[in-house]
């Protein structure tokens, strides 16, 4: 019966949505249709079609009142059950607080005591929470570069080798990067699940603070580069791990560290193939690739792309003027 009754709902809803004047306008359209397309008003006496309309609307009105009454009853019953359950829980917890002590307190006072006890227990858990990294994190900590094959790489000795994500794996957290953003992962080795309100996380344009309330922050310092705070986000994953995404403002530089107090990684050892360089548009990608090439050439003491361009022009000029002697010329 319900399915049969609502079979025209979609059609009528579509028509009703086009009536910005609401129900009066919608009813006016229905009456207009009956006037123009049927003999509803002229095929019978006015008293007859008025009675028909009243019968239909009275029937639907009674159904609406009955349905609304049933909904109110169901809601009140649900609220009573909920209230009874809460009273039972409060009573049980009051008894648990002090089995040997009779307390003459109100429900509100009992609720306040329970909340205070829960807050204390939660804070005790947080205060006793260890900051030890997981074993897997310790095993994968980034190692310093102790040996180089090229003389030009001597300046990289002592710096940390980038991890597979072009970032760094430290004792308490891991970060990776592309030219566009930094991904930070902070696992908490706890025996209980964290909640978002247990955390203190602040992302500034040039600063980052991450930690558990009541404890020394795990990270609290100046970022290596500036970030867009409105595009940077964090999420608590599986109640154990904080994941933070920082959106770089300068998308043409690799970060050598997350915060200035961190050990430095060797940006010369970064593998751009593992970054999202392919996601950049053609013009930006060409510019970044040229910049990275010139940076490597300068570090190796070799000519940059601009230097090569000048050398090519000079060679062509020499070929066009063989009569000229360039052997005693010095070029910068």
UniProtKB/Swiss-Prot annotation:
Subcellular location as annotated:
Cytoplasm
GO molecular function ontology, one term from the record: unfolded protein binding
Subunit description: Interacts with PCID2.
The annotated phenotype of a deletion mutant is: RNAi-mediated knockdown results in multipolar Class I dendritic arborizing neurons forming a bipolar morphology. Dendritic arborization is unaffected.
List the SUPFAM superfamilies hit by this protein, alphabetically: HSP20-like chaperones
Q: To which protein family does this belong?
A: Belongs to the nudC family.
Q: Which PROSITE patterns does UniProt cross-reference here?
A: CS
One GO term (biological process)? protein folding
Outline what the protein does. Answer: Chaperone protein with functions in nuclear localization and cytoplasmic mRNA trafficking. In postmitotic neurons, acts with nudE downstream of dar1 to ensure correct positioning of the nuclei in primary dendrites and as a consequence, is required for determining multipolar neuron morphology. Stabilizes PCID2 in the cytoplasm and thereby is required for promoting cytoplasmic mRNA trafficking.
Quote the protein name from its UniProt record: Nuclear migration protein nudC
Query: Would the keyword Cell membrane be found if you checked this record's keyword annotation?
Result: no
Write down the species: Drosophila melanogaster (Fruit fly)
This protein's GO CC annotations = cytoplasm; cytosol
Q: Which UniProt keywords apply?
A: Chaperone, Cytoplasm, mRNA transport, Phosphoprotein, Transport
In which broad location class does this protein mainly occur, judging by the first location in its UniProt entry? cytoplasm
| UniProt-listed CDD domains | p23_mNUDC_like
Pinpoint the CS domain residues. Answer: 168-259
């Amino acid at each position: 019966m319900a399915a049969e009754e609502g079979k025209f709902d979609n059609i009528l809803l579509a028509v009703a949505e086009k009536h910005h004047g609401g129900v009066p306008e919608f009813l006016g359209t229905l009456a207009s249709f009956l006037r123009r397309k049927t003999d509803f008003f002229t095929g019978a006496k006015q008293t007859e079609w008025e009675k028909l309309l009243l019968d239909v609307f009275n029937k639907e009105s009674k159904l609406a009142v009955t349905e609304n009454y049933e909904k109110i009853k169901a809601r009140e019953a649900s609220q009573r059950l909920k209230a009874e359950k809460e009273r039972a829980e409060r009573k049980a917890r009051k008894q648990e607080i002090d089995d040997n002590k009779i307390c003459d307190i109100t429900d509100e006072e009992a609720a306040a005591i329970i909340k205070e006890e829960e807050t204390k227990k939660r804070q005790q858990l947080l205060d006793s929470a260890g900051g030890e990294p997981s074993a897997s994190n310790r095993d994968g900590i980034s190692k310093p570069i102790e040996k180089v094959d090229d003389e030009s790489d001597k300046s990289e000795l002592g710096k940390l080798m980038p991890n597979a994500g072009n970032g760094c794996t430290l004792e308490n957290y891991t970060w990776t990067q592309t030219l566009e953003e930094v991904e930070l992962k902070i696992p908490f080795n706890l025996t209980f699940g964290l909640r978002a309100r247990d955390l203190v996380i602040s992302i500034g344009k040039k600063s980052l603070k991450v930690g558990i309330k009541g404890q020394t922050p795990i990270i609290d310092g100046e970022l290596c580069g500036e970030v867009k705070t409105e595009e940077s986000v964090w999420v608590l994953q599986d109640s154990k791990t904080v994941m933070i995404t920082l959106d770089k403002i300068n998308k043409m530089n690799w970060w050598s560290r997350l915060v200035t107090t961190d050990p430095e990684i060797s940006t010369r050892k970064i593998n751009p193939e593992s970054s999202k360089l392919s996601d950049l548009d053609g013009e930006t990608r060409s510019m970044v690739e040229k910049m990275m090439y010139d940076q490597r050439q300068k570090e190796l003491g070799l000519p940059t792309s601009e230097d090569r361009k000048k050398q090519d022009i000079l060679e062509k000029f020499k070929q066009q003027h063989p009569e000229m002697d360039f052997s005693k010329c010095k070029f910068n």
